[in-house]
């Protein structure tokens, strides 16, 4: 790059030419360091009148050192000539030592590495001096640099090394010779190796020092310029500041110099603006002097009279103690509806902050009829908003203005708000209860006429209180207490019933299974007695069954009259009459057990419902019974033979039904998701059978196919001991009746306690 293209500024063309000749001939100069050439630095000085412009001079010095750094990097020699001479002499000495088997004593001379030569040269110099002392008689002192050289030769070698240090870009190798052969061939090569090593270290070290000096000077000049323009906030100064803030290393100097050359106009302009007065950072902003804000004391009494007296005294103190004149009173009727919506609902700066800034005007505002009317209207707004807090519906400001179109103007300032608060009756807590206890809808607000009042116990009373405003706080708490008492009573009854059922199933498993088998036999005989009796007997049985239903209904009705003993006697007489109708010729089927269990569950459900346990218990029992009865009815259709089938073919018919049931291809559609497994999962009852598994019952509908066959074929054998089984069956039925009596008695006493 020619010097005419270098980004120097504010200097003459003659100075630029002088600088150009300096860098062109820098290799031939005795000293390369710019600091040793003050006539070069003087060409970069920029004067404004009779004074020196420091910032512009710093910029030219920055460009000078950047270009000096680039020149050092471009003209740096590789010193290969010196290195090759070193290797040539090292080979001569190594061969000499190997011939005489002395190489082990001078291990540092075996091989040289160019990278680590500077650190290894100290050891090499010691071995060379040691070897020269061995070859040349006499001793060599440690202070000596060479072996047996004259003073003139040593001075010439030192001068040559100093020139190489001052100008590392161009050097001359000094030739050490021995024309009279005074030292010999090998001693002369030792001195040559010592000189070449010192020359290589001097050249490389001086170049590294000069490159570091140039880089450090560049950073110093750059930081000085940054400090000078950092307060300027114009565009060119900020842009120049960003460019000069780039961090620099030895490898980034070239790219940085390219950026300075491309943005020469912007950077020089920013330095020219440095002479102008610097603007403050707040000059472009609007300056304001806020008026002092008065502090108010906390009012303990919010009555009308106390407020008026306190504010009258406060306004007098403000008018006498303030240093500024209050503004004249402005009527609120002059404000438009847009200002009303903006101040009331948006909370704008004009509506809210103006009341704070103009506190003296507000306190001196007269209490005329207009302000009082506005306060009343604001009071109605607050009341309406308090009543609608349960709505949780967001309205736009325009909607609220339309909703309260009866208001012509909005209250302005703190005086109107205080007047409104003075009219609020804070001692009446009816509406406060509404705000605290009313439920909040988070997502979607339901219509008021479609709210489910049964979703919670407290909502109906609050809704009536919100709409009519008639019920008092005592009535609300009383109704809530009654509802809570009902819940506690219901939970206590359910807990007692569960405890009674747990007592039933605390018997050992074997005894319980035996009792259930007898119960199944008895239920089977009751279910199928119509198949073998004559028509007349069937009619009588139907009549007795009807009497049984009537007696059950009568029993439930007598619970309300506390006549439990009479109803239980009728139930015992009905059960004993049925026992006399047993027919031993009819075989037992496994489906009758769960049918009887379902029938007894239905009876117990009805008793519980009639005793006042509530709708939730009924729903729970109904769901459980429907679940059990669905599988029961489905199994009954498959396992139970038709009525016209001969009794002797029942066993064969059941075998075929079991095969069809186990065959997935011929399975009935009702049993697509039903399968018999060797180990059935336990089915737990939600209410009637706590801690009991259905598979404990000897029921064919819940047993595996093999167990079902064994049960069917063993039914005839069980009938041979019918008399004995009937005795055990009577004991089992008596126990069941005792359990039912306990349950009904418990429910009756619970109902009496409630009454």
Curated annotation (Swiss-Prot):
Region (Disordered), start-end ranges: 312-333, 522-555
Question: What is the organism of origin for this protein?
Answer: Human herpesvirus 7 (strain JI) (HHV-7)
Post-translational modification (record): Phosphorylated at multiple sites.
From what superkingdom does this record's organism come? Viruses
Keywords noted in UniProt: Phosphoprotein, Virion, Virion tegument
Q: Where in the cell is it found?
A: Virion tegument
Q: Which InterPro entries match?
A: Herpes_UL11/UL32
Q: Which family does the record assign?
A: Belongs to the herpesviridae large structural phosphoprotein family.
- Polar residues bias locations: 535-555
User: Which Gene Ontology terms cover its molecular function?
Assistant: structural molecule activity
Where is it chiefly localized? virion
This protein's name: Large structural phosphoprotein
One short Pfam family name for this protein? Herpes_UL32
Give the UniProt entry's GO cellular component terms. viral tegument
């Amino acid at each position: 790059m020619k010097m005419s293209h270098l980004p120097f500024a504010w200097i003459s063309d003659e100075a630029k030419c002088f600088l150009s000749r300096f860098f062109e001939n820098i290799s031939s100069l005795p000293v390369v360091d710019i600091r040793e050439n003050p006539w070069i630095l003087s060409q970069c000085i920029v004067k404004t009148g009779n004074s020196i412009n420091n910032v512009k001079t710093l910029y030219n010095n920055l460009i000078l050192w950047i270009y000096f750094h680039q020149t050092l990097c471009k003209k740096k020699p590789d010193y290969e000539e010196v290195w090759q001479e070193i290797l040539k002499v090292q080979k001569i000495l190594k061969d000499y030592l190997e011939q005489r088997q002395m190489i082990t004593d001078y291990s540092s001379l075996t091989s040289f590495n160019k990278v680590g030569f500077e650190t290894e040269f100290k050891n090499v110099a010691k071995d060379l001096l040691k070897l020269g002392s061995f070859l040349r008689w006499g001793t060599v002192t440690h202070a000596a640099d060479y072996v047996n050289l004259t003073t003139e030769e040593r001075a010439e070698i030192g001068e040559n090394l100093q020139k190489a240090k001052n100008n590392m870009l161009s050097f001359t190798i000094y030739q050490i010779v021995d024309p009279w052969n005074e030292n010999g061939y090998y001693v002369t090569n030792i001195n040559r190796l010592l000189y070449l090593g010192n020359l290589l270290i001097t050249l490389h070290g001086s170049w590294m020092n000069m490159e570091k000096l140039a880089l450090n000077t560049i950073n110093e000049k750059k930081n000085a310029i940054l400090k000078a323009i950092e307060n300027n906030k114009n565009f060119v100064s900020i842009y120049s500041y960003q460019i000069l803030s780039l961090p620099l290393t030895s490898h980034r100097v070239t790219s940085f110099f390219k950026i300075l050359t491309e943005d020469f106009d912007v950077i020089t302009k920013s330095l020219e603006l440095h002479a102008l007065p610097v603007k403050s950072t707040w000059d472009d902003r609007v300056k304001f002097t806020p008026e002092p804000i008065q502090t108010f004391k906390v009012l303990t009494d919010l009555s009308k009279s106390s407020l008026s007296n306190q504010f009258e005294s406060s306004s007098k103190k403000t008018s006498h103690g303030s240093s500024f004149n209050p503004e004249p009173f402005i009527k609120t009727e002059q404000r438009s509806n847009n200002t009303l919506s903006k101040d009331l609902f948006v909370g704008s700066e004009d509506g809210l902050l103006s009341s704070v800034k103009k506190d003296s005007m507000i306190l001196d505002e007269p209490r005329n009829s207009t302000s009082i009317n506005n306060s009343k209207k604001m009071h109605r707004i607050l009341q309406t908003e308090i009543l609608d807090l349960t709505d949780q519906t967001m309205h736009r400001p325009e909607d609220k203005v339309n909703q309260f179109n009866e208001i012509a103007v909005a209250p302005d300032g703190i005086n109107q708000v205080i007047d409104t608060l003075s009219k609020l009756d804070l001692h009446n807590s009816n509406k406060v209860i509404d705000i605290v206890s009313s439920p909040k809808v988070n997502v979607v607000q339901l219509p008021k006429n479609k709210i489910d009042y049964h979703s919670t116990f407290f909502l109906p009373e609050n809704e009536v209180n919100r709409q009519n405003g008639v019920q008092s706080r005592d009535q609300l708490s009383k109704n809530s207490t009654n509802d809570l008492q009902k819940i506690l009573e219901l939970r206590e009854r359910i807990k007692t019933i569960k405890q009674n059922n747990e007592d039933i199933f605390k018997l050992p498993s074997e005894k319980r299974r035996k009792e259930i088998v007898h119960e199944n036999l008895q239920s089977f005989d009751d279910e199928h007695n119509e198949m073998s009796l004559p028509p007349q007997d069937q009619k009588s049985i139907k009549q007795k069954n009807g009497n049984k239903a009537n007696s059950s209904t009568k029993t439930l009705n007598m619970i309300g009259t506390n006549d439990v003993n009479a109803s239980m006697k009728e139930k015992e007489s009905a059960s004993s009459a049925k026992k006399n109708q047993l027919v031993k010729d009819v075989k037992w089927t496994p489906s009758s057990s769960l049918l009887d269990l379902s029938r007894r569950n239905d009876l117990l459900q009805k008793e519980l419902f009639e005793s006042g346990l509530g709708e939730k218990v009924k729903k729970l029992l109904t769901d459980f019974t429907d679940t059990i009865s669905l599988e029961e009815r489905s199994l009954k259709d498959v396992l139970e033979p038709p009525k016209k089938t001969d009794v002797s073919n029942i066993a064969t018919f059941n075998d075929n039904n079991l095969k069809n049931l186990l065959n997935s291809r011929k399975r009935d559609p009702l049993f697509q998701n039903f399968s018999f497994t060797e180990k059935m999962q336990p089915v737990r009852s939600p209410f009637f059978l706590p801690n009991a598994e259905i598979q404990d019952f000897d029921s064919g509908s819940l047993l595996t196919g093999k167990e079902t066959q064994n049960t069917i074929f063993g039914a005839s054998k069980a009938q041979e001991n019918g008399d004995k089984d009937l005795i055990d069956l009577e004991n089992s039925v008596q126990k069941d009746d005792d359990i039912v009596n306990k349950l009904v008695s418990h429910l009756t006493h619970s109902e009496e306690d409630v009454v």
